[in-house]
A protein has these predicted regions:
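Active-site region of the double-stranded beta-helix
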Residues: 1-17, 31-181, 189-216
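Conserved beta-strand-loop-short alpha-helix elements that form
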Residues: 184
């Protein structure tokens, strides 16, 4: 899977220049992912989801997550992003994608679907303890990224509640994705994303053995 998304870039070059080092955005080479997350997929996924976040412009909604697509769509139209987690458990195509990534990269793989309404964002500036591969399947989304010097090697068992983004001094970079584009965000890199149009994207997170805990 990784090789397919790299286009003309070799796997060796990706590993030496980008993997766990620096972001990479490539156009059009992830077009095969577009059918994996459409609104039809969402209609099927929402009633199956037991792990969903509803968030709008950095604020997490505390009420129970919607259990039907009409409920989810109503919240989406109010400006809420829907984050459907562990989608590989509920969809065969996304499970195949997760298995393909797991066969190429050592780590625990999970897939999230992000549905973000136009002119909104879900989470504010944050970083993850996973390496993240994002395929845009609908609409447009601008990602802003910064290297993390505050906590450059975060681990799952020591993720702080306050990430202290205000302490960061590194320059910002940006990439806008359209359907078929993809973006790699290394573990620990700051990022946030703003939808220009109603946006659908697949986020493949890979938790490496080293990122599980400080003791590994």
């Amino acid at each position: 899977m990784i090789g397919t998304w790299l286009g003309e870039l070799s796997r060796e070059q990706f590993d030496s220049e980008h993997f766990q080092r620096a972001p990479l955005a490539l156009p059009r080479v992830a077009r095969g992912a577009i059918p994996l997350l459409t609104w039809s997929t969402v209609i099927e996924l929402v009633p199956k989801q037991t792990d969903m976040l509803v968030v709008r412009n950095g604020a997490l909604r505390s009420d129970p997550a919607p259990s039907s697509f009409p409920e989810a769509l109503a919240l989406f139209r109010e400006g809420y992003s829907l984050v459907l987690r562990r989608c590989e458990r509920h969809d065969a195509g996304l499970r195949q994608l997760a298995d393909a990534v797991a066969a190429e990269i050592d780590g625990d793989v999970q897939i999230q679907a992000y549905l973000t309404p136009a002119n909104h964002f879900s989470f504010g500036w944050h970083y993850d303890c996973e390496d993240v591969f994002i395929a845009q399947t609908g609409g447009t989304k601008e990602y802003r990224l910064r290297q993390n010097t505050v906590n450059p090697q975060p681990t799952l068992d020591a993720m702080p509640k306050d990430m202290h983004y205000e302490r960061e001094t590194t320059p910002m970079m940006a990439a806008t994705l359209v359907p078929g584009d993809w973006l790699y965000i290394p573990r620990g890199w700051w990022h946030m994303a703003h939808a220009g149009e109603d946006s659908l994207s697949i986020s493949v997170g890979v938790l490496s053995p080293a990122a599980r805990s400080l003791s590994t």
